[in-house]
Amino acid sequence: MGKQIFNTAVICFTLTLIGLSLGFVLLKIQGDE
């Protein structure tokens, strides 16, 4: 049970990092135009 919670936390953390990275890249692309 504890391992499942840990896996869920890791997945959420990874998705958050990916979302922040994508958002940053999109802002950078829009700013360059």
Curated annotation (Swiss-Prot):
Record's bilayer topology term: Single-pass membrane protein
Swiss-Prot/TrEMBL GO biological process terms: photosynthesis
Residue spans crossing the bilayer: 9-29
GO cellular component: cyanelle thylakoid membrane; cytochrome b6f complex
Repeat recorded as keyword: no
Entries under NCBIfam families matching the protein: PRK11876.1-2
Family per record: Belongs to the PetM family.
Protein name: Cytochrome b6-f complex subunit 7
Source organism of the structure: Cyanophora paradoxa
Native organism taxonomy: Eukaryota, Glaucocystophyceae, Cyanophoraceae, Cyanophora
